[in-house]
Amino acid sequence: MTAELAIYEKFIDAGIPHYCGADSFALNGAFCGYGVDYAKLGVETADMVIEVLQGADPATTPIKTFDNGIVTVNTETAEALGIDYSGFAEKCTSVVETVTAEEFE
């Protein structure tokens, strides 16, 4: 993600919100990262596995999709761009706030 550290300020200077597909980009300066709610995905996957182990036919197991996920917003970048991101809350499982870091756990 070090590449993000090299470009995020250029997006801010240009007034462009940079949207990404992973939270790690927001941790490195992008406006926000949007991705799958892996906890919810894990629960749904486990439920499907239980059904199959109890005799359900995998060929007839319905496909499940998710209509929301987790958005990680870099609050420093949002402030620099003057963006109110409160509208994300009603469309996502959760909104995680972060600030720019060169390293993260």
Predicted regions and their residues:
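Short hydrophobic alpha-helices and adjacent helix-cap/hinge residues
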Residues: 1-105
